[in-house]
């Protein structure tokens, strides 16, 4: 049997370097992620060991369920960050965000 993996992705109309810089600017995640970020420990740019607290948003409404993201690693050479995410009801998942250049002007951002 062949396993199938489905992960969300986005094509961003910006060069890889710009997308990567935005991904490392954790205090601005709420500007592009469907979440309201409420805490960064330590504050500042993304660093391994940083813990972020957020509430999801749907249709412009902030949900009362909190999520915690634990930044595990930043791989600048491969443009990849790895998070352990504590979801409501005791669910934990590991997620990777990877930036892949398409050409000099666009970047694919792969989540999963």
Q: Each PLM stretch: what is its role?
A:
Residues 31, 40-88, 104-106:
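Glycine-rich portal/gate segments that line the openings of hydrophobic small-molecule binding cavities
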Residues 5-7, 63-68, 91-96:
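Short, surface-exposed coil-to-beta transition loops
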Residues 2, 9-12, 76, 101-112:
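Terminal "cap-and-tail" regions of soluble proteins that handle hydrophobic small molecules
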Residues 84-112:
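Beta-strand/loop substructures that line and gate deep hydrophobic ligand-binding cavities in soluble
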Residues 1-47:
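Hydrophobic ligand-binding cavity/cleft-lining segments
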Residues 8-10, 26, 36-39, 55-56, ...:
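Functionally constrained cores in energy, signaling, and assembly domains
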């Amino acid at each position: 049997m062949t396993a199938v993996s489905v992960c969300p992705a986005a094509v961003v109309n910006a060069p890889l370097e710009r997308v990567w810089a935005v991904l490392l600017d954790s205090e601005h995640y709420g500007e592009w992620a469907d979440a309201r970020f409420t805490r960064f420990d330590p504050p500042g740019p993304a660093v391994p060991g940083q813990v972020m607290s957020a509430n999801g948003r749907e249709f412009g409404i902030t949900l009362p369920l909190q999520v915690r993201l634990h930044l595990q690693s930043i791989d600048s050479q491969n443009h990849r960050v790895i998070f352990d995410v504590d979801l409501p009801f005791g669910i934990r998942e590991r997620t990777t965000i990877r930036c892949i250049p398409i050409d000099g002007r666009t970047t694919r951002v792969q989540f999963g």
